[in-house]
Swiss-Prot record:
Keywords: Glycosyltransferase, Lipid A biosynthesis, Lipid biosynthesis, Lipid metabolism, Transferase
Family: Belongs to the LpxB family.
Enzyme type, top EC level: transferase
Gene: lpxB
Role according to the record: Condensation of UDP-2,3-diacylglucosamine and 2,3-diacylglucosamine-1-phosphate to form lipid A disaccharide, a precursor of lipid A, a phosphorylated glycolipid that anchors the lipopolysaccharide to the outer membrane of the cell.
Protein name: Lipid-A-disaccharide synthase
InterPro entries, alphabetized: Glyco_trans_19 (IPR003835)
Superkingdom of this protein's organism: Bacteria
Length: 379
């Protein structure tokens, strides 16, 4: 009797666990008895993935934390490589977590196992030479965005554009009234969503200019409401401190909720750069991007960044569809002018382009990923 399909798979954090879950479901539609083994979180385990280590082992951020965990990470890596070389899967997939997964992939590829890296690192934006590392470690890269594939093609590195899972998850039309109801926001009022980032360093840099922008907006639009999405209690306390300092008289509605509801409920959005800009584009809300980093990071970014723009909607459109105010340009005056313009116009051109781009990257990524991997196995 033919043995079932066997897939090695490692996800290093919660977002990877979600991608792994969708991938496993899609493969099982074609191969119901397929086996998955490696490292997964609760969602992958619920789909039948055997996890050899706790996913938390890999979810370390920041240089100091990584150094502290290095001996353990190296041990886990060695044990995984040993396991997979002794029990070779039909294919191995590393989901994101490139610092860990590319090292595992390199060893396995050298041992004759086909390897796939799911989610391209941002090689197109900075440290482009990493592409040679990726080429050495993988048989295939699965990319979320079309310009990523174009970059790999330039270097003849096998890459498949599978569309973006966010574009699949977000409907083509979003329901503003329902989102307002969920958040308890008045329906007949204009709302600006304020998204100052998810990291402490981002709130440190952006809370003040964003709050002062709201102050100016309130003078011009006395009835406007401000709703702020904050990822956790720490960020909430940080924002409250800045609020008390710079505009205690203003009324902000603070929400410990996903950015998605907050964006959906709004008429316009002022945000820090990041995945949230892509989410805002998919939800078809007019936005302005403001971003500041410390002087050293800014100096390095200027030299290392290879893209004209920092926000994904602009990189995707290859034009400045969304205004980006960075560093010294990220001022209350500039942000105020742009948000005022967004609130006073219908933004038709911007929103039509957002819809067009949503269609570009909405391809059923889970299914596309499964198809690409199964095709590689058959090669």
């Amino acid at each position: 009797m033919e043995r079932p399909l066997r897939i090695g798979i490692i996800a290093g954090e919660l977002s990877g666990d979600t991608l792994g879950e969708g991938f496993i479901k899609a493969v099982k539609q074609q191969y119901p008895d397929a086996e998955f083994v490696g490292i997964g979180g609760p969602k992958m385990i619920a789909q039948g993935c055997e996890s050899l280590f706790d996913m938390e082992e890999l979810a370390v951020m920041g240089l100091v934390e990584v150094l502290g965990r290095l001996p353990r990470l190296l041990k886990v890596k060695a044990q995984l490589v040993k396991y997979f070389t002794e029990n070779p899967p039909d294919v191995f997939i590393g989901i994101d977590a490139p610092d860990f997964n590319l090292r595992v992939e390199l060893d396995l590829k050298n041992a004759g196992i086909k390897t796939v890296h799911y989610v391209s690192p941002s090689v197109w934006a900075w440290r482009q030479k990493r592409i040679f590392k990726i080429e050495a470690a993988t048989n295939l890269v699965l990319a979320f965005l079309p310009f990523e594939k174009a970059f790999y093609d330039k270097f003849n590195v096998p890459c498949e554009f599978i569309g973006h899972t966010l574009a699949d998850a977000i409907p083509l039309q979003s329901d503003k009234a329902s989102a307002r109801e969920i958040l308890g926001l008045e329906q007949d009022k204009q709302w600006l969503s304020v998204l100052p980032g998810s990291r402490g360093s981002e709130l440190k840099m952006l809370s003040q200019p964003f709050i002062e922008t709201c102050k100016k907006l309130h003078q011009k639009f006395p009835d406007i409401g401000f709703v702020v999405a904050l990822v956790n209690q720490k960020r909430r306390e940080q924002f409250e401190q800045a609020w008390k300092e710079h505009a205690p008289e203003l009324d902000f509605k603070l929400v410990d909720d996903t950015a998605r509801n907050v964006i959906t409920a709004s008429d316009a959005v002022m945000l820090a750069s990041g995945t949230v800009a892509l989410e805002c584009m998919l939800l078809k809300r007019p936005m302005v991007v403001g971003y500041r980093v410390n002087a050293v990071t800014a100096f390095l970014a200027k030299r290392l960044l290879k893209t004209k723009y920092v926000s994904l909607p602009n990189i995707l459109a290859d034009t400045e569809l969304v205004k980006e105010y960075l560093q010294d340009d990220c001022t209350p005056d500039n942000l105020f002018d742009e948000v005022s313009r967004l609130l006073e116009s219908d933004n038709r051109e911007m929103l039509d382009k957002f819809t067009e781009m949503h269609h570009w990257i909405r391809k059923d990524a889970d299914q596309q990923a499964a198809n690409a991997v199964l095709k590689l196995i058959e090669k």
